[in-house]
């Protein structure tokens, strides 16, 4: 079933509306709302024209991503709908034009796990996340800005959100628009994004999830030093079986890194969990 059909019955009246935009983003023209309708909660994102061209272009790129994936398989997307903002009553007084993006509210996928979680369950979670990432790549797209919060739980599956920095696999652009926390070493050297840079970001996400802690650095330069020179992977003794996977995801040289989700998935299936 195409995800867009799942919220095709969306009414334009809501029980609760709350502005969630951070102050700095708001000043740049970005708007992010949560809206409830009955038992369902949605997110609405749009950009006010002529405030910040870079952010406006990024949002328009995300809308175009959804338009191009409307007919194709959407197994990696949360239920969504692109909507004419002029039809939303609560925006009438703002005289807001253009289009906005509705997405169904979903839970974080990479939540904290307890020590009681067995290794088979952890591997299952990783493979579910890879299903979404593989579907994205097979549709011909690179996410370009993967973060832990972009992996969402929908029913019994993992889905992806936030495609403002997405690019075509066959024609990536040399744009420094990723988040330094998750940037592959080659991106700091001006190389274009790729499937492998998505996999590197996934490696950082996976590493932090397994360790239940986050990497830290203060400046862009500090992140560059960390990813290009200083990153060392250590796992708790109970999770050592996943070390070869992280090693293959976080190779500093792109030609030594896993080349595809399929290659990564095959490596995961060889892990001895005994």
Where do the model's predicted regions map?
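Activation segment signature within eukaryotic-like protein kinase domains
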Residues: 125-126
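ATP-binding glycine-rich loop module of kinase domains
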Residues: 28-67
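Conserved C-terminal C-lobe helix
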Residues: 238-252
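Catalytic-loop of the protein kinase fold
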Residues: 137-153
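Short beta-strand micro-motifs within the conserved protein kinase catalytic domain, predominantly
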Residues: 78-98
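Conserved catalytic-loop aspartate of Hanks-type protein kinases
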Residues: 198
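Conserved activation segment of eukaryotic-like protein kinases, specifically the C-terminal portion
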Residues: 173-186
